[in-house]
Amino acid sequence: MVSPLAPEAATVAPRSILLVGGTGVISAAATERAAALGHRVTVLNRGQSAARPVPDGVEVLHADIRNRASVREALGTRRFDAVADFISYTPDQAAAAVDLFAGRTGQYVFISSASAYQKPPTRLPILESTPLKNPFWQYSRDKIACEEVLFAAYRERDFPVTVVRPSHTYDRTKIAMVGGWTDIHRMRAGLPVMVHGDGTSLWTLTHSKDFAKAFVGLLGRPQAVGESYTITSDEYLPWNQIYRLFARAAGVAEPELVHVASETIAAASPELGPNLLGDRSHSVVFDNTKIKALVPDYTATIPFADGAREIVAWFDANPASQVLNQDYMDLTDRLTTWARSGQRPAGG
């Protein structure tokens, strides 16, 4: 186990850190920050990401985390002060991680999800002690099951788990609106854009660089073992404002926002339903007191107005990523026409 730190310490001294994944929306920023702070960083994945290349000086090991033999071969006898797992989603995968990393690390950090918190919430703000229950979304239930496996291993085998629950963390490549680039296209074309509910429910969006400040700050801290932490921004915006910030970033003064009940969207598009009903349709306000007590210098400083501009600028500079989803175009046309007419949506 690594040495305890004073509570006021902003970060640990250089540590050996393994990030499983390391090139995703959340993990790439964590990799970059950990390397910038002087940690000895290794990432383990199946290959490079063109969108988020690994920083210079970071060691890359190639193995498929689902193939335990290949991971053991890649790691050999190495130990790490902290292992951060960004790509375990099911209880079987969590159990495999316990098998792989028990005795190999002083801290195993599991990236869960704030969508695991009680839906609908019975009180705000949401705390780490808020019950974990999501009857709408299998993804969230699987994350809850992962946590149960890992905390059982902590209680029964001293497996050094720390659980982190982020909520809607983004980088420049991820558009927060349900329709993604299709919604930007519709705004610029003067077409109506569908917003779930009445657009007034509150949402939090956290830039991956802000997330990384808190996340890297808890790596290598023994006092975090056996604990769970929410990591989000403290900015809460209604969905109407989120859509308008994207419109402004896209050069559209006033988008036509048409409101459609989340249940109606879910009935018309089963693939969108779980995420809408199990996450986005509920107002969320998170209390970050616990992570700030552990990492006192953590403050999310990137407002989403800046994030929206960064996202649109990146897509404008990368035309190959400007992919229109024709199914979503058709769904939006159908449901916005219905919403404005008051008639039953055809086929809905």
Predicted stretch roles:
Residues 147-173:
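Conserved beta-loop-beta element that borders a ligand/cofactor-binding pocket
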Residues 177-183, 196-219, 226-227, 240-241:
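Substrate-positioning beta->alpha
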Residues 76-125, 144-149:
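NAD(P)-cofactor binding segment of oxidoreductase domains
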Residues 113-138, 152-157, 174:
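Active-site "gating" loop of Rossmann-like NAD(P)-dependent oxidoreductase/epimerase domains
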Residues 55-67, 87-88:
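Rossmann-fold cofactor-recognition segment
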Residues 15-39:
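N-terminal Rossmann NAD(P)H-binding glycine-rich loop of SDR-like oxidoreductase domains
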Residues 124-148, 177-181, 204-205, 236, ...:
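Short-chain dehydrogenase/reductase
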Residues 217-277, 288, 293, 310, ...:
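Mid/C-terminal beta-alpha module of Rossmann-like enzyme folds, strongest
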